Amino acid sequence: MLERIKNSILNFPGRNAFYIEGKFYTYTEFAKIISRIRYYLQSNTSKEENLIGITARHKNEIENYAAIYGSLFSGKGYIPINPANPLDRNSKIIEQTGIKTILTGTIDENVIELARYNNIKVVEIPGLPDADINLDVPEVDENEIAYILFTSGSTGVPKGVPITRKNLNSFIDAFYSFGYEINEHDRFLQMFELTFDFSVACYTIPLCVGACAYTLPADGIKFANVYTTLEEHEITFACMVPSVLSYLKPYFDEIKLDKVKYSLFCGEILYEDITSAWSECVPNSKIINAYGPTEATVFCLTYEWNKAKAQNKSFNGGVAIGKPMQGMDAVIIGEDNRILARGQKGELCLTGNQLTNGYWRDPAKNTESFFSIQEGGREKTFYKTGDSAFVDEDGDFMFAGRLDNQIKIQGFRIELGEIEHFARQFTNSANVAAIAFQSKLGTMQIHLFVESPKAALQEMTEFLRKNLPEYMLPTGISFIPAFPLNSNGKIDRKGLLSSVQDKNGIS
């Protein structure tokens, strides 16, 4: 990957690498910032300090992207941290990883508070001295960490997913094996926060071919900004979450994006009816449904939906997730980790070059989530995704829902148990229930139910806001004197949700 980016900088020095907040940055300008960061890290940090924090704000800054590659080119891994997330959550990430330095484009109150609370050094990138451009690719073991992303944890402690350089390079190689027709003239959409793994594809892939990544403006409605960016900048490669389509659907009759060559979706279920409607908006675009958890480096299965096909594959209305990418494999298991035959529904498990070696310093979680199978005299390690699926006779995989209490909203993975964890902390009540549902617009939302005779909506909302990122906050909270129970004595979650649906007309 670094060799590809180095070649892009050398071959296309005057072409644009990024468009951020109304400004273009050329590959040469980007390389200069990378080199300043690289020089600083190599001069001011020890080899033992192999993980560097970078800020990942809602508002994009060129320095944040340069910090990623400044870290990688200096032989270190990076950890994106959003300073706007709760201080306690960010502090747990810093405590787990032991990072001592955080790179940022702008120092604000959140960054200052984070640094003081955790006694770490903050480096403001614009203040770094100039340095000669240095694009030498470091000699680093491929099993060294490229980045660690932290996902929601059911105990209230974020869990780290380390991705190695081998994992990342394998993903890039697998992506290019598809033979997509992309080059330095293409324009990529980058709509994601840097703490979300899908962003890795949106900024790395264009940099590898000398193309330009277009980020969204911080102001305004995010999904509306997606459409504006697609249209005004004639985006050719659009990576999106399906929620974007749900938002734009009322305007499909007015949308015609002839320049889009590829529409790639990941992070949520892509429904066939809205995919078909979207295909009329992008008449020249291939539509790809991609699947993959953070543990398998961005995505690792793909299916191309094509309106010219006699019949596209789907299950319960959701487009197939397709076949494993180059270097990856997938199986369906039942009880006792037994591999099931085609057509049988079970848990989707993944193995291959993109798979993480395990959670960051969490052996108990690793034992729970990974298992090994002897195959051809070799031991293969598989990751249990927690997703229900089956594989058809053609080898295409179909997603059939979650096996546990985990969902995705706008691509962000959310453990409903984490929301319940903090709700219990506030109420001292054992009975709380965070329930996900689909709104009339087709977007996933969360309603929190609390068994309590006393309603304290404002206080609870403030408490949750202090402990959870914005995307995890419930869209509604209901206080109920006594929860309904089913015949097994368990909380009747369907009954709870029905009460809200009947009251508010939720679909």
Regions found by a protein language model. Name each.
Residues 14-44, 59, 91, 163-169:
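Conserved AMP-binding/adenylate-forming core of the ANL superfamily
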Residues 26-28, 144-173:
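Conserved AMP-binding A3 loop
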Residues 133-150, 157, 182-188, 194:
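Conserved pre-ATP/AMP-binding loop-to-beta segment of ANL
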Residues 23, 40-84, 187-193:
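Conserved AMP-binding/adenylate-forming
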Residues 159-187, 197-236:
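Conserved AMP-binding/adenylation subdomain of ANL enzymes
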Residues 209-211, 239, 249-316, 320:
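Gly/Ser/Thr-rich phosphate-binding loop
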Residues 3-26, 69, 102-116, 121-138, 146-148, 168, 286-289, 395-396, ...:
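AMP-dependent adenylate-forming
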